[in-house]
Amino acid sequence: AQDVIANGGTPEIGDLATPTNSSPFTRTFINALPIYRRGLSSNRRGLEIGMAHGFLLYGPLSILGPLRNTETAGSAGLLATVGLVVILTVCLSLYGNAGSGPSAAESTVTTPNPPQELFTKEGWSEFTSGFILGGLGGAFFAFYLASTPYVQPLVKIAAGVWSVH
């Protein structure tokens, strides 16, 4: 019988090759994410990740926020999203400037070639700059989409699902 779990490199860091993390599907999916995709600059990585965060945070913060059944729910959701993106950017900046900067990425079973240029102080600073720009852009784009007449009925349906009437 063949072992299902194999040693994937250094067992001290818990790098085991399981059928889940070493399958071709998982490796392709993880390596297609902006943080690990080849050929992207640090700024572009931050821009893509920030856009996703800003866009996806807007919905829950506007529909589930304390002003969800008011006329200002969209604006409140936008301001909450902008505030959260700014807080996340400050945290990323603190992480990049603490000590000697971000630690170098190690290759694992799932990510055999992590981007080394991202894990320098300069690279992390570019990533953080792209993150805030993308996060704010994603939040404003989601706000714009949610306020269009085509999406507004869907927003009202979603807001009604979680309301307490």
UniProtKB/Swiss-Prot annotation:
Name the gene that codes for it: psaL
Q: What is its main location?
A: membrane
* Name this protein carries in UniProt: Photosystem I reaction center subunit XI
Transmembrane feature ranges:
49-67, 74-96, 127-146
Recorded hits in InterPro entries, A to Z, give: PSI_PsaL, PSI_PsaL_sf, PSI_suXI
List the keywords (alphabetical): Membrane, Photosynthesis, Photosystem I, Thylakoid, Transmembrane, Transmembrane helix
For this chain, the family text in UniProt reads: Belongs to the PsaL family.
An example Gene Ontology cellular component term from the record?
A: plasma membrane-derived thylakoid membrane
A Gene Ontology biological process term: photosynthesis
Where does it live in the cell? Cellular thylakoid membrane
The membrane topology term of the UniProt record is: Multi-pass membrane protein
What disulfide bonds does the UniProt entry report for this chain?
Answer: none
Carries keyword Transmembrane?
yes
**Keyword Transmembrane, does the record have it?**
yes
What domain of life does the native source organism fall in? Bacteria
